[in-house]
A protein has these predicted regions:
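Active-site metal-coordination/substrate-binding segment of hydrolases
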Residues: 62-130
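N-terminal helical capping/dimerization or prosegment-like subdomains
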Residues: 1-65, 69-76
Length: 133
């Protein structure tokens, strides 16, 4: 599977997990698992359910933080949707579902981008890149 397909599948997995505010545990576990699979140096879920992953470069330097959220507005009108709010279906090149644009799509892209940057550079960068959600 190429990187684009991996990211699409990751986003679909995230969208398929309902995570209204205060109920993010399952999607947080997915983010943690993916960060670990991608080789993040440290991954933790804090007592509030937020996920933090660190990818360290080979040289000392500053830290950059990419931050997003993995909860979403509750679905109260599922019958009004043209696609299943938790289906993660692709239709005409678009992924449909609650959280695709706000903001599970962005979080999955950030995690993937950090992992691929580290891989492509052989971690030859200064500092560390953190992703939190």
């Amino acid at each position: 599977m190429d990187r684009d397909q991996q990211l699409i599948a990751f986003c679909q997995q995230a969208v398929q997990i309902p995570s209204p505010s205060g109920q993010e545990r399952e999607v947080a576990q997915l983010m943690k698992r993916k960060m670990e699979e991608y080789g993040f140096d440290e991954v933790l879920i804090d007592r509030y359910g937020s996920v933090l992953g660190r990818m360290r470069g080979n040289r000392p330097g500053k830290t950059i933080l990419l931050d997003g959220h993995i909860d979403h507005v509750d679905v109260i009108d599922a019958g009004e949707w043209s696609h299943d709010p938790f289906g993660g279906e692709i239709d005409q090149g678009r992924i449909y579902g609650r959280g695709t644009s706000d903001m599970k799509g962005s979080v999955t892209a950030m995690i993937s981008a950090v992992a691929h940057f580290a891989e492509d550079t052989g971690r030859d960068f200064a500092g560390e890149i953190c992703v939190s959600c």
